[in-house]
């Protein structure tokens, strides 16, 4: 999936090139769809009042918009995602709901979607943090590991716009962080999903070396080097394995001079 455009909320009916649009819907929401044209807003409000739209967290309602009914509306489909109670929404629940929306859109016949970002954010929360969580959840929602399947269900190449009243560099940063984080998590999931006879210490070491660049330095210690350092507890875990263990040391050095140092120690156990 790719981000191609960020739109201003005022231009929702004109500037978006997407063929569908997505709104969030809270239980106690009063002002529902005021940012779309009057006729479409009236229809959606009636559907909501009649109980045809679900605001339950994670529920998806799909509305088709024939021109004879939705006059002057530029989208062929409307996706409404339930967000539950306004004061209960947090990063994790929004991420989960966005994942549901992603899976629903993947199985539909639309190729692009415009997120009305303001409708997914409650006023009490940090707008940019929730925006990042929403995009992360949407991008991760379509993940599947089908490397070894004979019939692969390829991920749809879906383009999307983000419509927001807060168009600035902070929103750009939040969206870019979400894209980077989701891609990193997908790679981690791929590692975990590999079968044990494939993901050996050597393969995990190769993956780490491939990640290294000018800012990320990778050093791999083999059995003899670990033995020399007296790492007997570490070596004892792998003494029954056919393959010798590897200790992977990754060092991140940012371009800016930062005196703070943060250490993350992770454990990766492979089985043969």
Task: List each language-model region with its residue ranges.
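Short amphipathic alpha-helical segment within the helicase RecA-like ATPase core
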Residues: 1-268
């Amino acid at each position: 999936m790719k981000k191609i455009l960020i739109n201003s909320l005022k231009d929702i009916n004109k500037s978006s090139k997407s063929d569908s649009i997505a709104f969030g819907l809270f239980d106690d929401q009063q002002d529902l769809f005021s940012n779309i044209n009057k006729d479409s807003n009236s229809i959606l409000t009636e559907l909501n009042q009649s109980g045809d739209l679900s605001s339950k967290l994670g529920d998806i309602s799909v509305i088709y918009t024939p021109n004879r009914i939705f006059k002057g509306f530029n989208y062929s489909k409307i996706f409404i995602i339930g967000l539950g109670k306004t004061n209960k929404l947090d990063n994790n629940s929004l991420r989960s709901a966005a994942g549901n929306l992603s899976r629903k859109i993947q199985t539909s016949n639309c190729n692009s979607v415009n997120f009305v970002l303001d409708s997914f954010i409650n006023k009490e929360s940090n707008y940019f943090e929730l925006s990042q969580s929403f995009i992360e959840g949407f991008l991760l929602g379509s993940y599947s590991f089908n490397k070894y399947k004979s019939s692969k269900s390829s991920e749809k190449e879906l383009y999307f716009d983000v419509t927001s009243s807060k168009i600035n560099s902070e929103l750009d940063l939040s969206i870019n962080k979400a894209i980077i984080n989701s891609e990193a998590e997908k790679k981690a999931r791929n590692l975990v999903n590999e079968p044990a006879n494939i993901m050996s210490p050597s393969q995990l070491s190769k993956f780490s070396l491939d990640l290294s660049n000018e800012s990320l330095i990778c050093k791999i210690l083999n059995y003899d080097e670990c033995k020399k350092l007296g790492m007997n507890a570490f070596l004892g875990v792998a003494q029954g394995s056919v393959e010798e263990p590897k200790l992977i040391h990754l060092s991140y050095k940012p371009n800016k001079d930062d005196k703070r140092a943060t250490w993350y120690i992770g454990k990766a156990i492979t089985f043969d």
